[in-house]
Regions:
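Rossmann-like NAD(P)(H) cofactor-binding subdomain of soluble oxidoreductases
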Residues: 1-6, 11
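NAD(P)-dependent Rossmann-like dehydrogenase/reductase catalytic/cofactor-binding core
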Residues: 13-16, 20-23, 27-47, 57-64, ...
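Gly/Ser/Thr-rich loops at beta-strand to alpha-helix junctions
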Residues: 53
């Protein structure tokens, strides 16, 4: 429906050869794909993309958990996420997915606070270490996922889990 965001690492010759397929898979023939460089650069770019995704998702999870924590305000998290989808600086596809998921179960009572990691965040953290480039948001987001796989019972983990399931069909554990 929306096409793919394709990050291609290949020789110029190979990139030109597969360009028709890239254009067919992208949202438009002009957008949604890029020959980023030689072999390996596409995977590397996607890895960094996923590290950024981890940080963005963690920000939403933390913020929404803070809103939920002030019970005396009676804030409807679902209504807030729906509001933020329209004109807010934080509007995004991740927020769209979150708002839609919250319509069905705003308390996330049936969602276990467990967030899987599929490896890209680990690779991104290692890359930051190898390059000596501080990446505290990316590495902390990964650490939080590790913590969720243990004993934490936070609402924020449920938010992360529903987002990952909504955009990629990733595992979402149910309670019990």
């Amino acid at each position: 429906e929306n096409g793919y965001c394709l990050m291609v690492g290949a020789s110029l010759e190979v990139a030109k050869a597969v360009e028709p397929a890239l254009k067919a898979l992208a949202p438009t023939p002009q957008t949604g794909w890029l020959h980023v460089g030689p072999i390996g650069s596409g995977h590397f770019t996607k890895m960094i993309h996923n590290g950024i995704e981890y940080g963005m998702m963690e920000s939403f999870a933390e913020g929404l958990e803070l809103l939920k924590g002030r019970k005396e305000y009676g804030i409807d998290i679902g209504k807030v996420t729906e509001l933020w989808r329209h004109g807010s600086v934080v509007r995004s596809w991740l927020l769209d997915l979150t708002a839609e998921a919250l319509k069905g179960d705003p308390e996330l009572d049936e969602i276990a606070p467990f967030v899987a990691d599929s490896g890209e965040g680990r690779w991104t953290a290692v890359e930051a270490i190898e390059q000596g480039i501080p990446a505290p948001v990316l590495t902390q987001a990964l650490q939080v996922r590790f913590r969720s796989q243990e004993k934490s019972k936070g609402y924020g983990y449920k938010i992360l889990s529903i987002m990952r399931n909504a955009f990629g069909g990733h595992v979402m554990k149910k309670k019990g």
